[in-house]
């Protein structure tokens, strides 16, 4: 029966405090419009976060940024396999570019913003055709 008793503390924190910290942790947000374009929710989440990750890059980087697998998992909750699948889907659609640089190789990413915009425009025209006065 002891297994069923609620724990009174986690790492020195009262359980209610630890629970509240988890509940009010930063939410993971993605653009809903990316789901059909990216190939699913996982790829849409990856693409949304990639856009967020490169938002404040210096211009001399040309849009390229780097993230480790652990950083992606920490920031998005996606496992290694989910990341690999999302990356493949995005590469196949021309929405994400990748390159390996250095020794040991570091994986760099770049969102293809022109392709994303074209995809969003096509999707919007199709979705809203005949519903908006233009």
Q: What name fits each language-model region?
A:
Residues 54-110:
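Winged helix-turn-helix DNA-binding recognition segment
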Residues 1-71, 104:
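Short recognition helix of helix-turn-helix/winged-helix DNA-binding domains
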Residues 32-37, 95, 113-121:
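Short alpha-helical interface patches
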Residues 1-19, 113-134:
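Charged low-complexity intrinsically disordered patches
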Residues 6-8, 27, 70, 85, ...:
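Intrinsic disorder/low-complexity segments enriched in polar/small residues
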